[in-house]
Amino acid sequence: MTRSLESSSIKPKVQIILASGSESRKQMLEEAGVIFDVKVSDTDEDKIKKQISSLPFSEQVVDLAKAKAESVSREFNEAVVIGGDQMCVLDDRLLHKPGSKEKAIESLKLLSGQKHYQHSGVCIFKNQSCIWHYSETVELKMHSLSEAEIINYVEMENPINAAGAYKFESLGCNLFSYVNGSSHTVRGMPLIPLLNALRELNIISCLLYTSPSPRD
């Protein structure tokens, strides 16, 4: 249901674009039956994070989601653009995507036996304007894990691009003793609120999550 998108391929009908390269967000939309295209934003996230670092994390994820969606909306003005962002926080400390197995192991050692939070923000842009945004926070507690368990998990799932260094949608869910909130939010996007917004804005239909206008 997805494809990579170039500027020349835009159609003059209802188009949904996910402004993210996140496999998890793509998977959730596909599982919901949404027909969409993908255009990864070229937003300088590090620069924006510095500018908004004093805000609560629940607001930061929305601002980052908006920046991504706005960037793509400028290029595809008539499209409906979905932006999303996620932050994993332990004791007010932001845990970045590890980027390597070694750093993933370090992150999981910090999270082992501890409560932490996953903040997810999502927005919808059209004509370079934000027409809806939302954020949600989930509290999680990880089991106390041995070093061997942590290393074994990292070797099995290689979660180097995951916020918190775990993939909750697969084996990572076994790491937790307690989760208070939506699994979709833990995976990186508050899916049900997003689907409700798309329906209320008449972007998708009520029963089948496809564009109300036929696509060529």
Please place each PLM-identified region on the residue numbering.
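N-terminal polybasic phosphate/anion-binding patch
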Residues: T2-V80, R93-L94, L145-A148, I192-L195, ...
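Residue-level signal for inorganic ion chemistry
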Residues: L29, A65, D85, A104, ...
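Catalytic beta-strand/loop signature of glycosyltransferases that borders the donor
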Residues: S41, W132-H133
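Active-site-adjacent loop/tail segments of enzyme domains
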Residues: Q60, Q86-H116, M142
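Short beta-strand segments
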Residues: I82-G83, G121-C123, E169
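Short acidic-glycine loop/turn motifs at beta-strand connectors
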Residues: L90-D92, F125-S129
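Active-site oxyanion/phosphate-handling segment shared across diverse enzymes
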Residues: H133-S205
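A short, hydrophobic C-terminal helix/tail in secreted or cell-surface proteins
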Residues: P212-D216
